[in-house]
Design a protein with these regions (language model features):
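Phosphate/NTP-binding elements of NTP-utilizing enzymes
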Residues: 2-220
């Protein structure tokens, strides 16, 4: 601890009198008011058509189109339906099913209903690959969502984002990642590739993670 000189104390008092150590009230108001805006009523399908960008292999983006995968409209509508809490989609590989979850997640991050999102993949390698290929571009290519990311040093990492007080996180399916956690929207991505322990009970794991969420809970 260092004792300040009289001159330093006088200078500090002068700065205090000038509110030099206070945050700008306009900045505080601007940052806070955006959370008071009522959420826009928009369906996942409408959001997808208006806002969703798909990152191409060459780095360019293209607008998502229902014409290419018209069968995805029904799963999106199911996620929006108040009385439906679990949407199970048996599907072949690369049929666009994961895009449904991505579109719903993007819509809720930008327009609500807000809540923690937990996205489970088979293991660390799968998490790393998805984070680079998809998760990172999701935020880079959608300005409305990116604008809501917190400004703290831990609010944005490759596998985790904090959006308006809630977290969106990629997780490797394991006993450690399925305990003491809670999420409003839980995605089980390619569950057939999970370890035998979780292949048979991943849905029950999700239900346990949503016991305190209430009627807004969704599992995909």
């Amino acid at each position: 601890m260092r004792v300040l000189t009289k001159q330093e104390i006088a200078e500090a008092c002068e700065l205090i009198a000038q509110d030099a150590f206070c945050a700008d009230i306009f900045d505080i108001a601007t940052e806070t008011l955006r959370f008071l805006d009522p959420p826009r009523e928009i369906s996942t399908l409408e959001y997808s058509i208006e806002h969703r960008k798909i990152r191409q292999s060459d780095g360019e983006t293209a607008d998502w189109s229902l014409d290419l995968t018209p069968y995805l409209a029904q799963p999106m509508a199911a996620l929006d339906a108040p009385g439906i809490h679990e949407v199970i989609v048996p599907k072949p590989a690369r049929s666009g099913g994961t895009v449904v979850a991505e579109n719903y997640a993007l819509k809720t991050m930008e327009f609500g209903p807000a809540g923690d999102i937990m996205w489970y993949l088979a293991g660390p390698d799968e998490v790393g690959s998805y984070a680079e290929r998809v998760f990172k571009p999701l935020f880079e290519d959608h300005e409305g969502v990116a604008a809501k990311i917190g400004g703290g040093p831990s609010d944005t990492t490759l596998r985790r984002k904090r959006i308006g007080g809630y977290t969106v996180e990629l997780l490797a399916m394991s006993g450690k990642t399925t305990t003491n956690r809670q999420g409003r929207f839980i995605v089980f991505d390619e569950p057939d590739s999970y370890s035998k322990k979780f292949t048979s009970n991943f849905l029950e794991q999700g239900r346990q993670r949503q016991r305190m969420v209430g009627s807004l809970r969704k599992i995909y």
